[in-house]
């Protein structure tokens, strides 16, 4: 009986992981543990044969975010395997972000069999419920143990996962009960793998395919007739939520839409929009701040979630015309201001249906409308002011970095922006300079959680990568450096060291004294970054002159591994300089 259970634990684990590779899984992040032993051993066998990439992480929280980074950059489903107990609870932060950003991860968690539940057994908790609120599906094998499952059971689980990620990409929780023994003898492992290799490894299966472009969408033509292509409007593109594999079709549809409308386009730094799109307006957030009344139109087409801009939110809230919000991979409500008609089926389907409603516009391309010309000229005026003001000296500030860095980091190399200050500064000051490349930022739940682990996951797929992050965001996830071969990944970390949460200076400084502000919000930490980097064997370079930053990037790229470039920020000078520039723009 014991031999049967150990063989079945291993064999069913092999089947399961192999079937996941057949629906496109290439990467698995493995966390340590005993109860998950059969999964670990099975993953090891598949890894030896190059069927599955396996990377280990001792921190489940970090592993979850690392897997999310991989999934985001690759467009493929990724796996995380953990043991039982609190290990499962540590997956929740990454599951929340995967849920809100619509990225597919399967969290596979090992558990005790049913006989050990609710009786005080060690390391036995109600882990099957931990991720319920954020996962698209919560699945399980036989509650007595996976050894009691058959071929059809395992296949059905993977078919369910495939169907779910096609319908609504996001996290999935698969809880697997394992009865002891968890280990397997060398003899039994060899014997079982030979059977698996002969009958299962090269077996083909028919899984559902993505036919998103051919959905039979029943959407009223009256909806599209509300759009008047003869009148002015604006296209606003927020953070991209689709798959990286769909970016080409996304941009093709957007290009077609802009051509038939002639409308100007506002884009987020992480919109995924190509720099070659016509009608792009630079410095649009500063235009809204300076004079939103310059925008005279009665219709707006929005794509994706709302950008992190109070000025944009205020503009849309007070806009009296038609707003249509088109979503990618997201069937939930996505408009916090609640003033738009929401379309769930993506931009490609939207443009096709729009053209169907306006057949006479199909082949007509319009020049940029007058509103677009006005906005682009206004953006150019602000650009000249920024050019004059930003580089009057070489002191490094956060807003200067937002403008300068995307222009000197090689234009085809990707960038990731951490949450909090960087994404907001780049929205305001980057002048669309991110659009020549892939630019990532995790705007689902918008937390600083998992910043380093996410970046390392992206760098595993697309490199070299630049991560722009504040000091608190980096230290919060410093365990990311403990992920297998993390130090060898080609990641440049631009560390903006302002000794705490500088964003809170802008929010609470006026009503709190300095010590209260530090204790309650900024929370400064006197970290010796040089010693910390040395402890993880990560090279670090300090830069204090803006003109030396290009040279520092050349150094980091030559290292071809994880490195830190640290820039120290004088918070008082930062705030004064920022306010002076904004005043100059507003009074111009």
UniProtKB/Swiss-Prot annotation:
**One example of a Gene Ontology biological process annotation:** phylloquinone biosynthetic process
Q: What is its EC number?
A: 2.2.1.9
Entry cofactors: Mg(2+); Mn(2+); thiamine diphosphate
Name the pathway.
Quinol/quinone metabolism; 1,4-dihydroxy-2-naphthoate biosynthesis; 1,4-dihydroxy-2-naphthoate from chorismate: step 2/7; Cofactor biosynthesis; phylloquinone biosynthesis
Please report a single Pfam family linked to this protein. TPP_enzyme_N
Q: Does the keyword Metal-binding apply?
A: yes
The cofactor binding remark recorded in the entry reads: Binds 1 thiamine pyrophosphate per subunit.
- Domain of life according to the entry: Bacteria
Catalysed reactions listed for this entry: isochorismate + 2-oxoglutarate + H(+) = 5-enolpyruvoyl-6-hydroxy-2-succinyl-cyclohex-3-ene-1-carboxylate + CO2
Which top EC class applies here?
transferase
Residue pairs linked by disulfide bridges in the UniProt entry: none
What does the record give under GO molecular function? Answer: 2-succinyl-5-enolpyruvyl-6-hydroxy-3-cyclohexene-1-carboxylic-acid synthase activity; magnesium ion binding; manganese ion binding; thiamine pyrophosphate binding
Q: What does this protein do?
A: Catalyzes the thiamine diphosphate-dependent decarboxylation of 2-oxoglutarate and the subsequent addition of the resulting succinic semialdehyde-thiamine pyrophosphate anion to isochorismate to yield 2-succinyl-5-enolpyruvyl-6-hydroxy-3-cyclohexene-1-carboxylate (SEPHCHC).
Homology family: Belongs to the TPP enzyme family. MenD subfamily.
Describe its partners and assembly state. Answer: Homodimer.
> Which NCBIfam families has this protein been placed in?
menD
**How is this protein named in the record?**
2-succinyl-5-enolpyruvyl-6-hydroxy-3-cyclohexene-1-carboxylate synthase
Species in which this protein is naturally found? Prochlorococcus marinus subsp. pastoris (strain CCMP1986 / NIES-2087 / MED4)
């Amino acid at each position: 009986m014991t031999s049967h259970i150990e063989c079945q634990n291993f064999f069913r684990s092999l089947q399961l992981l192999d079937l996941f590779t057949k629906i496109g899984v290439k990467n698995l992040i493995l966390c340590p543990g005993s109860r998950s032993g059969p999964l670990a051993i099975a993953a090891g066998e598949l890894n030896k044969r190059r069927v599955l990439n396996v990377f280990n992480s001792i921190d489940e929280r970090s592993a979850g975010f690392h897997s999310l980074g991989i999934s985001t950059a690759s467009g493929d489903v990724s796996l995380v395997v953990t043991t039982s107990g609190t290990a499962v609870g540590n997956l929740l932060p990454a599951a929340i972000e995967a849920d809100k950003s619509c990225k597919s991860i399967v969290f596979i968690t090992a558990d005790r069999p049913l006989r050990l539940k609710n009786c005080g057994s060690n390391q036995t908790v109600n882990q099957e419920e931990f991720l319920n609120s954020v996962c698209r599906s919560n699945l399980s094998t036989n509650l007595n143990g996976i050894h009691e499952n058959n071929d059809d059971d395992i296949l059905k689980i993977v078919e369910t996962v495939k169907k779910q990620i096609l319908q609504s990409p996001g996290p999935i929780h698969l809880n697997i009960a394992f009865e002891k023994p968890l280990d397997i003898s060398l003899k039994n492992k060899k014997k079982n793998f030979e059977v698996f290799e002969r009958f299962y490894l090269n077996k083909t299966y028919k899984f559902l395919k993505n036919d998103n472009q051919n959905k039979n969408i029943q959407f009223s033509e009256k909806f599209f007739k509300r759009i008047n292509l003869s009148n002015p409007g604006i296209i606003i593109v927020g953070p991209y939520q689709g798959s990286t594999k769909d970016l080409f079709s996304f941009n093709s549809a957007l290009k077609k839409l802009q051509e038939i409308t002639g409308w100007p386009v506002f884009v987020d730094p992480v919109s995924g929009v190509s720099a070659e799109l016509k009608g792009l307006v630079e410095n649009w957030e500063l235009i809204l701040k300076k004079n939103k009344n310059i925008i005279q139109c009665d219709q707006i087409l929005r794509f994706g979630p709302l950008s992190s801009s109070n000025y944009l939110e205020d503009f849309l809230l007070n806009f009296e015309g038609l707003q249509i919000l088109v979503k990618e991979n997201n069937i939930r409500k996505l408009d916090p201001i609640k003033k738009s008609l929401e379309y769930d089926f993506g931009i490609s389907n939207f443009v096709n249906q729009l053209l169907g409603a306006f057949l006479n516009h199909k082949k007509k391309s319009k020049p940029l409308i007058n509103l677009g010309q006005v906005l682009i000229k206004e953006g150019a005026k602000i650009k000249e002011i920024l050019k004059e003001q930003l580089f009057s000296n070489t002191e490094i500030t956060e807003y200067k970095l937002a403008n300068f860095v995307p222009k000197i980091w090689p234009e085809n190399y990707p960038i990731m922006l951490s949450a909090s200050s960087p994404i907001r500064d780049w929205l305001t000051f980057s002048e669309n300079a991110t659009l020549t490349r892939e630019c990532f930022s995790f705007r689902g739940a918008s937390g600083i959680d998992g910043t380093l682990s996410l970046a390392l996951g992206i760098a595993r797929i697309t490199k070299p990568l630049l991560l722009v992050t504040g000091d608190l965001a980096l230290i919060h996830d410093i365990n990311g450096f403990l992920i297998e071969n993390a130090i060898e990944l080609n990641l440049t970390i631009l560390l903006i060291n302002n000794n705490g949460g500088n964003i809170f200076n802008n929010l609470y400084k006026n009503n709190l004294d300095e010590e209260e502000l530090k204790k309650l919000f900024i929370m400064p930490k006197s970290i010796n970054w040089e010693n910390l980097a040395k402890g993880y064997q990560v090279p670090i370079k300090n830069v204090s002159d803006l003109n030396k930053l290009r040279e520092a990037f050349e150094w980091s790229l030559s290292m071809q591994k994880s490195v830190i470039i640290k820039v120290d920020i004088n918070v008082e000078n930062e705030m004064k300089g920022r306010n002076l520039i904004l005043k100059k723009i507003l009074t111009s």
